């Protein structure tokens, strides 16, 4: 069995893809205008308030961007054939590990769940505006009790306004290109490490050099996902024994090199990565649960005429985009469909030359294999791997070759565990406003809200006479904004929208400077041989071998009796393999030669090379220079709570309905009549006590002003209705125009409680990053986080922009050719078989089995990498989500003091 070649050096790790962008948040839908007030109903018994509109289901969180495509695994070196007496071929240099694909862009968040249309407002009888107090009239005799009036018709619901244009979403801060992890050392400033140099050419024997001293630690790069393990190649057929070459003198020992290249100074922050393809919109949310029915409202008055619909309000200006909140990580959405591949980017600039590499020591020749049997035998099991040679000093990096063309992308590998979550960067600047998306469709009606608590009935005053209409009152002060509401349950994932076009290429960053090399480390201990691997599967049938020559004719035997022609016998089993011959003597060690000039970098070796055992860790190098503090990184992924949008301005106050005419006074204490239909909202009544601060809902878009109702004749003040339970505050709408001033009502008896302080105003656009502060002391390395769960294989992301080329290595001197290995001992010739008794001349034997395929030649050099495709254009903004949840009406204030008793009313209808 041949000597197993040393393992080749490991392939270079691909740089992790940049983090995908977070998709734009869909704008909130506009709040629909309130319907016109319905006709006021006659004095009836308190009707139950209308069910509040459902609360819209919160849209699903945007789908998470596609994970970066795992890098193409390095080619596995070709395993040497088990040629009898043949020296096992050197393993090829490992293939360069492909750079991981660019991380998929974070998908655009799905549409916000459609807001349920508010339930029809119960036609609440409007409270008549209180006229000026007249002089107390004489107490009249009570008239006959009137029957309850017929319930008024239900007021029509005004059409839901179209949502206003969405505020432009600022683009995300551009993502910098992550650097490759530098060697371990004191942690320098958070600079981007330089790119890794091209892998050096394996030495003559491929013996890995000892580990060099670790340089100063640069900023910790993002950990790329490991590529999948390459599949094990099929074992080749057993080759015919080759002739053993003559033993040559061993090559000279090379100078001790360094396993790791010099640590470069922290690189300048690279150009921002291109914008990823936005993900699809989420699916529409599900309808929320039905609320319970509200408590009975106050008594309605006689139905009035339907109000005239007011003019449509102008949409307000969209609020500024607030800063990104530091929320908890969001739940990963389903990956969107694969976006189109971006255009190829421009090739990067060639980096600065690297230091010259030293030549490694020549490896010790392996023992000669034992002779094998003659003929083409079946392939035996693979022997145990040979001992690793004494590691010679690693050669310094040679001249970096020009980038080859981009190879065909390999198959997707199984994604490795997720790396630790990086620190959240500062928020990026607000970008230019994008075009407004189309208006979302109206969502379905939601279930009714819960019943409000029924308040205590107010004191019923004596019916007063209808006074003349008072002058219009001045608008009341705006109540304090409610406290933020709790986060609603997460809705189902919305329908995924279309994928936008790819983004444009970012600018290319300048290459980093080359750092000084660290000291060389000591040689590591020689590793022990590993256990023998399992026998590989049988290889393909080889090509026919050369036809053997006819041997000399044997002596004529005695003619035997002619036997009957028998049937061809079964093929006998193949004999056992002969014993392995002893290893030949090891040739003398040649003199140590002087280090020859390092040769240029050769093409990548064939796939299948084994990686040599790592050398011992070198001494820690001196601390590297502090890196240049890079600009603020891109903002981190949105948390679970999401970024709170800007607080919308308060929606317009709709014109209050007009007061209905005063109906006939009923006898106090009469039996309650049937439940009346809730009347339309009345005009603005007496300012009640200030309600408690409600929970602000989701910020709605600009609402449209409600229709201006026609002011009707003032009606008598009805009995105060029961105070309903505080409704769920909806999202504050945009600030609308001031409504018409209402009539001045009498002051309330109780002063309302002071409301909670209002929410902060809209957050302005994020300013430009400030100047860089002084570099702080070097922090300690944090613990590496536990690997995250293995994510599902995402679709192929768009090809990212080409990173800056690595430093151009100095071309090394060509090394001297190594000495030829010792010639193996010729195999023992097999014995001639014993001549059998001559019989009848047999038939010609079958042609011998084809000879085994010779050892595969080295893999050709990889083609030059083609230019990286440019990213496509930025995708169109997603569709505008439906309107936000309409907030329910606040709780009614306490009733004012009863008016003076009026004269008795006429008898009611029978």
UniProtKB/Swiss-Prot annotation:
Hydrolase in keyword set: no
Compositionally biased intervals (Low complexity): 10-31, 115-144, 169-184, 208-223, 266-280, 289-300, 362-371, 427-444, 460-475, 501-523, 550-570, 583-598, 674-743, 756-769, 786-807
Subcellular location: Secreted; Secreted, Extracellular space; Secreted, Extracellular space, Extracellular matrix
A cellular component annotation (GO) from this entry: extracellular space
S-S bonds: none
PTM text: Prolines at the third position of the tripeptide repeating unit (G-X-Y) are hydroxylated in some or all of the chains.
Biased composition (Basic and acidic residues): 40-54, 571-580, 811-822
Tissue expression per record: Forms the fibrils of tendon, ligaments and bones. In bones, the fibrils are mineralized with calcium hydroxyapatite.
UniProt key word ATP-binding: no
Keywords attached to this entry: Calcium, Collagen, Extracellular matrix, Hydroxylation, Repeat, Secreted
Pro residues biased stretches: 895-910
Main location: secreted
Region spans: Disordered: 1-184, 200-910
UniProt similarity note: Belongs to the fibrillar collagen family.
Role description: Type I collagen is a member of group I collagen (fibrillar forming collagen).
Oligomer and partners: Trimers of one alpha 2(I) and two alpha 1(I) chains. Interacts (via C-terminus) with TMEM131 (via PapD-L domain); the interaction is direct and is involved in assembly and TRAPPIII ER-to-Golgi transport complex-dependent secretion of collagen.
Protein's name according to its UniProt entry: Collagen alpha-2(I) chain
């Amino acid at each position: 069995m041949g000597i197993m070649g040393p393992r080749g050096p490991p392939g270079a790790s691909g740089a992790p893809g940049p983090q995908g962008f977070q998709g734009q948040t869909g704008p909130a839908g506009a709040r629909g205008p309130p319907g016109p007030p319905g006709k006021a109903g006659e004095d009836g018994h308190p009707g139950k308030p209308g069910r509040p509109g459902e609360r819209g289901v919160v849209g699903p969180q945007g789908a998470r961007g596609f994970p970066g495509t795992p890098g193409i695994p390095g080619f596995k070196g070709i395993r040497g054939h088990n040629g009898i007496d043949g020296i096992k071929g050197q393993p090829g240099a490992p293939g360069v590990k492909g750079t991981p694909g660019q991380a998929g862009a974070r998908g655009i968040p799905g549409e916000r769940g459609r807001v349920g249309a508010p339930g029809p407002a119960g036609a609440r009888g409007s409270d008549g505006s209180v006229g000026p107090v007249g002089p107390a009239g004489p107490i009249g005799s009570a008239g006959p009790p009137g029957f309850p009036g017929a319930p008024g018709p239900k007021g029509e619901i005004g059409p839901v306004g179209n949502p206003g244009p969405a505020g432009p979403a600022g683009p995300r801060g551009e993502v910098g290109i992550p650097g490759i992890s530098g060697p371990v050392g004191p942690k320098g400033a958070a600079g981007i490490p330089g790119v890794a140099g091209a892998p050096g050419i394996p030495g003559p024997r491929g013996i890995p050099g000892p580990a060099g001293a670790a340089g100063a630690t640069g900023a910790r790069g993002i950990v790329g996902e490991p590529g999948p393990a390459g599949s094990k190649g099929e074992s080749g057929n057993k080759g015919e024994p080759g002739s053993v070459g003559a033993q040559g003198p061993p090559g000279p020992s090379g100078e001790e090199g360094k396993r790791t290249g010099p640590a470069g100074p922290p690189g300048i922050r690279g150009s921002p990565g291109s914008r990823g393809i936005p993900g699809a919109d989420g699916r529409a949310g599900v309808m929320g649960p039905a609320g319970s029915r509200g408590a009975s409202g106050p008594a309605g008055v006689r139905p009035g005429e339907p109000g005239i619909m007011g003019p449509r309000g102008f949409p307000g200006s969209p609020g500024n985009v607030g800063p990104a909140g530091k929320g908890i990580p969001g739940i990963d959405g389903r990956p969107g469909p694969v976006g189109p591949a971006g255009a190829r980017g421009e090739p990067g600039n060639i980096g600065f030359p690297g230091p010259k590499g030293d030549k490694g020591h020549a490896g010790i020749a392996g023992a000669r294999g034992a002779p094998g049997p003659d003929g083409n035998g079946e392939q035996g099991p693979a022997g145990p791997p040979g001992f690793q040679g004494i590691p010679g000093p690693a050669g310094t990096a040679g001249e970096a070759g020009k980038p080859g063309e981009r190879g065909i992308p390999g198959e997707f590998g199984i994604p490795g565990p997720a790396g630790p979550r990086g620190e959240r960067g500062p928020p990026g600047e607000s970008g230019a406003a994008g075009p407004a998306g189309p208006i979302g469709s109206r969502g379905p009606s939601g279930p009714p809200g819960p019943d409000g608590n029924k308040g205590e009935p107010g004191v019923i005053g004596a019916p007063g006479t209808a006074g003349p209409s008072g002058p219009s009152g001045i608008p009341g002060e705006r109540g304090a904004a409610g406290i933020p509401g709790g986060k609603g349950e997460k809705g189902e994932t919305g329908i995924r929208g279309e994928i936008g076009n790819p983004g444009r290429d970012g600018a290319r960053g300048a290459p980093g400077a080359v750092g000084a090399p660290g000291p060389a480390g000591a040689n590591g201990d020689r590793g022990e041989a590993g256990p023998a691997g399992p026998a590989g599967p049988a290889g393909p049938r080889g090509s026919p071998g050369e036809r053997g020559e006819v041997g000399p004719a044997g002596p004529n035997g005695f003619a035997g009796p002619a036997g009957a022609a028998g049937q061809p016998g079964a093929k006998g089993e193949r004999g056992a393999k002969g014993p392995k011959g002893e290893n030949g003597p090891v040739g003398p060690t040649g003199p140590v030669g002087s280090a020859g000039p390092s040769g240029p970098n050769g093409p990548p070796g064939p796939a299948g090379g084994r990686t040599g055992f790592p050398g011992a860790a070198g001494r820690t190098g001196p601390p590297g220079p502090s890196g240049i503090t890079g600009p603020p990184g891109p903002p981190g992924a949105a948390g679970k709570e999401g970024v709170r949008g800007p607080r919308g301005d308060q929606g317009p106050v709709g014109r209050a309905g007009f007061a209905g005419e005063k109906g006939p006074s009923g006898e106090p204490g009469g039996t309650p009549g049937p439940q009346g239909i809730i009347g339309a909202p009345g005009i603005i009544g007496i300012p009640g006590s200030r309600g408690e601060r409600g929970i602000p809902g989701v910020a709605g878009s600009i609402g449209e002003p409600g229709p201006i109702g026609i002011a009707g004749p003032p009606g008598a003040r009805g009995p105060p209705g029961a105070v309903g339970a505080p409704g769920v505050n909806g999202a504050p709408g945009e600030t609308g125009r001031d409504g018409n001033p209402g009539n001045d009502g009498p002051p309330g008896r109780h002063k309302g409680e002071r409301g909670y302080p209002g929410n902060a105003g809209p957050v302005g656009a994020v300013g430009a990053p400030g100047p860089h502060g002084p570099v702080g002391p070097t922090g300690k390395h944090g613990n590496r986080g536990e690997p995250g769960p293995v994510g599902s294989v995402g679709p192929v992301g768009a090809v990212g922009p080409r990173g800056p080329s690595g430093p151009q290595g100095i071309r090394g001197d060509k090394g001297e050719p190594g000495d030829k290995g010792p010639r193996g001992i010729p195999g023992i010739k097999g014995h001639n078989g014993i001549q059998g008794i001559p019989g009848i001349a047999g038939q010609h034997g079958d042609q011998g089995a084809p000879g085994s395929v010779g050892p595969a030649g080295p893999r050709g050099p990889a083609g030059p990498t083609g230019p990286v495709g440019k990213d496509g254009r930025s995708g169109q903004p997603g569709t505008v989500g439906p309107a936000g949840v309409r907030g329910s009406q606040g709780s009614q204030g306490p009733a004012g003091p009863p008016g003076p008793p009026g004269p008795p009313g006429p008898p009611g209808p029978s």
